[in-house]
Amino acid sequence: MEGRSVSLRFLPALTADRRRLYSNRPHGEPVHAGSFIRKRRIVVDRELERQPKELARILVHELFHFAWVRLGNPARHSYESLVRKEWEQRARGELGWSAESRKRALRNRLRSMRGAASPHWREYVCESFCDTAAWIYSGVRRHSEYTLATRHRDRRAEWFRTAFQHGAIPI
């Protein structure tokens, strides 16, 4: 990865609600981490300091939020097309809870791809990208959240190999 530095901060008891991140507050739902793209900052729940594999998986996921915004429209549309094909094939599962939870919510909102331009769809595609990157690059080979079928995993891995074949991943 290459780009300007990204600061990392550990805080206790992270929760999030309506795109806000809290520490030690009774607001929102528990989360592992959050990224602030413009501020170039990642905040991680302090509990992960004692879980190196989970920390690696979560950190890679968060770093790829920075990669997503630098990816450019053609590559983002290409990845979206891959995910759209999975959706049309009714692929079950995902490569992380971030994408899985959004995919489940989308099933209730979208019965066809007419809503594919919605913010919910775009958020799902981004989370899918970040969870897939964490699966590929974190070194965590097995996890209970890796539920996407092998054939779809293989297609995503090939997409990443092709997209980033020329060197460093810009963040």
Tell where the protein language model's regions lie, with residue ranges.
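Generic structural signal for residues in well-ordered beta-strands
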Residues: 6-10
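Active-site scaffold of zinc-dependent metalloenzymes
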Residues: 11-81
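Metalloprotease/metallohydrolase-associated module, dominated by Zn2+-dependent proteases
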Residues: 1-4, 17-32, 76-171
